[in-house]
Amino acid sequence: MAASMARGVSARVLLRAAGGSWGPRAGHAAVTSRTFGTTGERRAGEEAADSPELPRDVVNVVFVDRSGKRIPVRGKVGDNVLYLAQRHGVDLEGACEASLACSTCHVYVSEAHLDLLPPPEEREDDMLDMAPLLQENSRLGCQIVLTPELEGVEFALPKITRNFYVDGHIPKPH
């Protein structure tokens, strides 16, 4: 029976083949169907997108896009910078979805805040080595988690990235 179920044969067909039915039999309870619920989609490392509830949880961040436009956003303590940018329409790709397998979320961290971040781990450094236009203040947005000390931080996007999407395509979170 398990092999049949694995091949996609429904329980109803199996019950009928065995002489059973979905209706109640004398001395037996009726078979009821079950419904399944799902939780909202969330990628690894992504925090809930709701606004910070307490002022102490707010971290004001400014993204500077490739054209130089400043985009101020309100993040919250614990937010991942890549997902924060994507929620606010900032063109930060994140092709590998924060799995440290690309460098498309490469950002420049404001000098005043760079030393407030923990040093990059070896895997992040390895990915940054593949990023074009690397600078001393380069980091991967997927590896930066907001803390209260990062209040007022600026993340500038480099003029180019080694992207994995077709020109003109606007990246969207998966």
From Swiss-Prot:
Residue stretch of the organelle transit peptide: 1-43
**Cofactor or coenzyme needed:** [2Fe-2S] cluster
Report the record's Gene Ontology biological process terms. [2Fe-2S] cluster assembly; [4Fe-4S] cluster assembly; iron-sulfur cluster assembly; P450-containing electron transport chain; ubiquinone biosynthetic process
Q: Which domain of life is it from?
A: Eukaryota
- InterPro entries reported for this sequence: 2Fe-2S_ferredoxin-like_sf, 2Fe-2S_ferredoxin-type, Adrenodoxin-like, Adrenodoxin_Fe-S_BS, Beta-grasp_dom_sf
Quote the record's cofactor note. Binds 1 [2Fe-2S] cluster.
Its cellular-component GO annotations read: iron-sulfur cluster assembly complex; mitochondrial matrix; mitochondrion
Query: What is the annotated localization of this protein?
Result: Mitochondrion; Mitochondrion matrix
* Residues involved in [2Fe-2S] cluster binding: 96, 102, 105, 142
**Name of the molecule in the record:** Ferredoxin-2, mitochondrial
Q: Which residues form the 2Fe-2S ferredoxin-type domain?
A: 59-161
Q: Which UniProt keyword terms apply here?
A: 2Fe-2S, Electron transport, Iron, Iron-sulfur, Metal-binding, Mitochondrion, Transit peptide, Transport
Q: What does this protein do?
A: Electron donor, of the core iron-sulfur cluster (ISC) assembly complex, that acts to reduce the persulfide into sulfide during [2Fe-2S] clusters assembly on the scaffolding protein ISCU. The core iron-sulfur cluster (ISC) assembly complex is involved in the de novo synthesis of a [2Fe-2S] cluster, the first step of the mitochondrial iron-sulfur protein biogenesis. This process is initiated by the cysteine desulfurase complex (NFS1:LYRM4:NDUFAB1) that produces persulfide which is delivered on the scaffold protein ISCU in a FXN-dependent manner.
Any one GO molecular function term: electron transfer activity
What's this protein's family per the entry? Answer: Belongs to the adrenodoxin/putidaredoxin family.
Main localization of the protein? Answer: mitochondrion
Species this protein is from: Mus musculus (Mouse)
Q: How does it assemble?
A: Component of the mitochondrial core iron-sulfur cluster (ISC) complex composed of NFS1, LYRM4, NDUFAB1, ISCU, FXN, and FDX2; this complex is a heterohexamer containing two copies of each monomer. Form a heterodimer complex with NFS1. Interacts (in both their reduced and oxidized states) with the cysteine desulfurase (NFS1:LYRM4) complex; this interaction stimulates cysteine desulfurase activity, and serves as a reductant for Fe-S cluster assembly.
Which stretches of sequence are listed as region Disordered?
26-52
